[in-house]
């Protein structure tokens, strides 16, 4: 059970980081385009 829990936590962490990084990357790209 412990291994399954770790895998679930790892997947949730990856999904969370992806959801958080998505908007940040879009924001940084828009800022760079604005500066150029």
Curated annotation (Swiss-Prot):
GO terms for biological process: photosynthesis. Keywords: Cyanelle, Membrane, Photosynthesis, Photosystem II, Plastid, Thylakoid, Transmembrane, Transmembrane helix. It comes from the Eukaryota. It is a single-pass membrane protein. It is found in: Plastid, Cyanelle thylakoid membrane. Coiled coil: none annotated. InterPro entries: PSII_Ycf12_core-subunit (IPR010284). The keyword Membrane applies. One of its GO terms (cellular component) is cyanelle thylakoid membrane. Pfam families: PSII_Ycf12 (PF05969). The chain crosses the membrane at residues 8-28. Its main location: plastid. A core subunit of photosystem II (PSII), probably helps stabilize the reaction center. Belongs to the Psb30/Ycf12 family. PSII is composed of 1 copy each of membrane proteins PsbA, PsbB, PsbC, PsbD, PsbE, PsbF, PsbH, PsbI, PsbJ, PsbK, PsbL, PsbM, PsbT, PsbX, PsbY, PsbZ, Psb30/Ycf12, peripheral proteins of the oxygen-evolving complex and a large number of cofactors. It forms dimeric complexes. This is Photosystem II reaction center protein Psb30. It comes from Cyanophora paradoxa. The lineage of its organism: Eukaryota, Glaucocystophyceae, Cyanophoraceae, Cyanophora. The gene is psb30.
